[in-house]
Amino acid sequence: MNASREPRPILSGPVLTRVGGIPVDALDIVADPTRLLLAELAAITERLRRLSEPLTDVLFNLVPRLDDDIALRRKVLSGKRAVFNLKRPPWDQDTLDRVTARLTPAEAGLLEEWMRVQAARAAALAKLEDQLSRERAETVQVLRAALDGPGVLESMAIAAPEWVRHADLGAATPRNVKTLYSYVSRAAVKTSPFSGLTTVGVAGNEGGGRARSRAAAAMAMLALHRLARSPRTAHLLTYRGAPVRPAGGDAPGSLLLHGEMAIAGGVIWRQDSVMEADHAISWLDRLGEDDLSFAQVLERLGGADPFARFIRLLDAGVLTIVLPWRLSEAPLERLAELVDGVPESPISADDLRTAHALGDAAHRERVKGRLAAFDGLGRYARSWADPKRGRPVPDALLYEDRETEAVLPDICAIPSVRDDLLSLGELMRPHLFRSHIYDLMLEEFVAAFGAGGTCDDPLAFFMRLAVERDGNGPLDVAMADDMRARANPGERAWLPVGPTSAPPSAAVLFQLEAEDYAQVAEGRYRLVVNHFSAGSGALFTRFVRLLGADFRSRLVRHIMSTRPGVACRELVLWTDCNTAQAECANLLPPLSLPGEPTRPDAITLDDTRLVHDAGTDTLSLVDRRGEPIGLTYLGLIPQHMVRSYARLLVVLADPWVNASPHSDYTLAKLPELLARCRPGQVVPLPRVQHGRVVTRRASWLAPTSALPLPRSGETPAELVVRMDAFRRAHGMPEEVFVHHLGGGDFFTAGDRKPLWVSLASPTSAQVLEGWLAPGVEYVRITEALPARNAHPQLDAERRRRATEHAAMLIWPEES
């Protein structure tokens, strides 16, 4: 299909709304008296600043006239320095009287006013100190009270079980306050679905408060490998040699597809690598290409101790386990069925069923029940794990999603909102371009099979492109070319793709700022664009089981509408070990990759061919009858984070790079933002707005050394006055979000979510200090937009809730 040059998209599919799990007023940690005192002190400081220069001149001119009183001259010099620094001269009353006596009446009046303003400042500071002392205790109480909302503490028991279990949640200790502040602010103003800290619903519906939970997918993988390594249960499973293909071309030898579970920073994935088969090829020749029973494996391996060989090949990834569960099945329950009646099993069927039940029932439990579920799952995970062989205990053992109970308006049915999104799409479209990785596949395919050619073994083709020797030069170059093209895609935005590939699309994540939805309906609002994601539906599929049949069918219709007349299949990836990926799967008939669970209507790459259309110079995947396959990747893991041969497949499914600058996502702007940072300077960047649509919040790039963080020996009042002065000096609002900008490595900015900060709260400054990652030199400070008091969604108690909406835009193919 040719990419349409019509810039206006269409809205497609359901609209997903994320709802904050805690009302935004839970962050009312700064009282009005504090704001009034800070305003008073700011006015006093401004008055002192105006007085400072003339009074400094007065004292400077006085010094030469004090040769007759050296001691007084020294005191005047120290007083001059104090005035220059807007401080009270360090004089007693006698010194003040003696200095005044040496001045003219006008000069004395200036000094008297300085001392009077300084006294007013000292009085205001004392009041502020008292106010902050009360506010500190009230802050902890306010934050702690937020945990008492419906379902909040239950969600916290999943997010931070050890804190909920052991901490005094209302304690004013720095560590507890930091944890309390971080979670409450996240649930109140950062709409990122996690248990009940952010709930989800379908726009236009009233949420039913449904929930679902499960044990982590990695739990089943730990158990599976434990069973495979035991001679008492290895016979219950089926095995297969790792995929191997000829190196192709002039390259000798064979290539091996090696997969292993990897865990880092709490994220679990299957790390697939294409490498030279080397000495593994002799073993793979023995094993053959078919599925094998345990007895067949031992027979083919032979030797004095075939089981030892079996274990070595299993650990090396040369031999793989065929997953015994299907996509629609609960993995732990399926393993329990396998070991039923095997008394010598290293893991009992009862334990496997109990582990499944603990995860499956957790969403119905209160706090104690959830903590008990964590305890049970933790015991099982520790007994099944094998850290020495790269299978440690996962950080996240329990997964939960929750549906909102709110009535959610169909915001995209409001004509002005709909028109704003479509107009945004017009701005975006020239910045959506075909990836250079697609070009690489085209070039390599035509070189190997000729224009209009056919490849009967697509897996071999993708493996050859992704082989890892000293890096992967061509693939790395293509990714670098994509980065360079983001600034000016030009004609790349209009390059064609085949029927396997999706047309340009995007999911727009946005928020509305208005007093209420009546104002939105009248067109009196701001639409703030937070981020773009894949328009395939990948952001939505995680919630299909939660949100029900109608949501599912609308999502399927959306996917099918992107490729009319083409049978679509889902590219399944990492569902064996990554829980979120597993939750996203099973919407469409799958194209199953090696290492993935399957289902009866699944096909593999062995059931397909890759073909080139010489007329359009595009690639398509077809079945053995020659019918095109519409391929869609629906995983939560963004496709730019997928590596090895699977990266080529996700690019074939969706070849479009979204380089649109029309969202306020810090990580996407990181190279640009870092280039604009200046040592020792706070660099302001203005808000960018197109009518009602805000595509970039006002922000400030600041060295971490410039931030008003706590100082040793400083009182809370002195700290908060510095914070207030910092924000006023740079024109910042009181409430902001702080984002990391790089540091130790390129991805540091993505390691921690933005932190909500009140620049009128010493508690915020203390939390900010602990939040900053080591090695981060710069931060981006953004205005909090929408403001907390301008979220239009109200809960049943008429309290405001932060909401974020996700709507999908597609640009249909050119007719």
Segments from the language model and where they lie:
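Type-3 copper protein
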Residues: 1-214, 279, 286, 306-577, ...
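C-terminal structured domains
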Residues: 531-779, 783-784, 801-813
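Short acidic, hydrophobic short linear motifs in intrinsically disordered regions
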Residues: 289-301
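Surface-exposed recognition patches
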Residues: 260, 299-300, 304
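Short amphipathic beta-strand/extended segments with alternating polar/hydrophobic composition
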Residues: 266-276, 457-458, 628-637
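Segments forming glycine/polar-rich beta-alpha architectures that bind adenosine-containing cofactors
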Residues: 229-234, 238-244, 438-452, 603-614, ...
